[in-house]
Amino acid sequence: MKEFNNLPLLSGIYSFSVDKLTFDLICIKNDDASIVKNFWQGNYDRLTLTQWLKITEKEGIYFDIGSHTGLFTIIGLLSNPKNFLISIEPNFINLGRMRSNLRLNDLLKNNSQFLGAASNFSGEGFFSTHYDNTFLSKGGRISSSGEKINIIKLDDITINDNRKIRGIEIDTEGEDYNVLLGAEKIINNFRPDIIIEVREKNKLEIFQFLAKYNYKTWLISDKVTSNVIPVKLSNLQITSTASVNIYATIENIN
């Protein structure tokens, strides 16, 4: 966000488009990085969001893990109005903004929100958040200290719906591999499409886990490519301070 510090602060309701979809999002003094970057640069996370749009076109149940202010949840609900989205967000301020964004777009139905974090166990833990005047854009993470929060593994969530779990989006600032471990039964039973944030320190663990269930992996990060390309995570070089988005599926894609 530093590159936008000398530009006017954005406050209001802003239109956001992903392929065929257009919806509104709230921003107050640059507090949502996705809106700020999209406003000044356009096509924010185009590859990732477009891929999620394609995934969620099929009716089913979807998880948005680390849902922040609801961008992926909104896309999943608009992509197919019959979908059901389960959104997990540990920061109550972000969750409040997500609910406001859902209400703004008349999307309060077919969505369940959980205030907490996802991992490989269910219980309590601590969540460390970096606050400043753009706190909605800052990533927090499960830590040894911070705010006490509820933690849940996806396999422990009771879903009273017989429809297939078709997709999981995971953006948890380094907890991503543990989220996969906590969803192993779901992944084994349903083989959902997965979009996951990957770092150098967890790429091998994530690759080995996905390979065990015969997933193919594709790079969908606008930061490093303009197209969806197949990639073997064990060969992918990621800088220590960066992350990339990976699309994992058992299907062949064009």
Per-segment meaning from a language model:
Residues 40-63, 124-126, 138-190, 201-205:
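Short internal loop-to-helix segment that lines adenine-nucleotide cofactor pockets
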Residues 67-69, 92, 120, 172-174, ...:
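Short, glycine/acidic-enriched loop or turn micro-motifs at the edges of active sites
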Residues 13-14, 80-84, 157-254:
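Conserved acidic-Pro-Pro-aromatic motif
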Residues 28-30, 114-116, 151, 220-222:
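Conserved beta-strand termini and adjacent loop/short-helix elements that scaffold enzyme active sites
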Residues 71-74, 96, 123, 177-181:
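Short N-terminal helix/helix-N-cap motif within the alpha/beta-hydrolase-1
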Residues 24-28, 151-152, 227-233:
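Short amphipathic beta-strand/extended segments with alternating polar/hydrophobic composition
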Residues 1-155, 158-162, ...:
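S-adenosyl-L-methionine
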